[in-house]
């Protein structure tokens, strides 16, 4: 099945990402959603926003990470994996990293999300 990864400047649409890994052969859809929080132990005061930037090769790196994870945990290629990391100015509550996985069974879906 397919796996893709992106670096995005636009807000991440969780509904679209979940739909992209849903299908008639998938009995499980799992996700990881990382969002901007309002505190950081190393920050002075309340966090109200973050600015994410990335290395020029970040797109290639995220693709390689997702590919290597799929090869390691799903060598038969049975799952669909989507990963998006947002860059730019993000407010508290904005989605920063989303990984969605669709597979026949939940164990593989959760394993790929955790990896």
Regions found by a protein language model. Name each.
Residues 1-95, 102-114:
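N-terminal, polar/charged subdomain of small-to-medium soluble alpha/beta proteins
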């Amino acid at each position: 099945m397919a796996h893709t990864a992106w670096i995005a400047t636009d807000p991440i649409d969780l509904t679209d990402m979940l739909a992209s890994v849903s299908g008639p052969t998938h009995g499980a859809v799992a996700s990881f959603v990382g969002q901007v929080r309002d505190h950081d132990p190393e920050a002075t005061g309340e966090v109200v926003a973050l600015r994410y930037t990335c290395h020029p090769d970040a797109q290639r790196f995220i693709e390689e990470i997702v590919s290597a994870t799929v090869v390691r945990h799903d060598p038969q290629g049975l799952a669909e994996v989507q990963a998006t990391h947002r860059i730019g100015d993000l407010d508290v509550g904005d989605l920063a990293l989303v990984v969605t996985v669709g597979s026949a069974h939940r164990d593989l879906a959760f394993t790929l999300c955790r990896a």
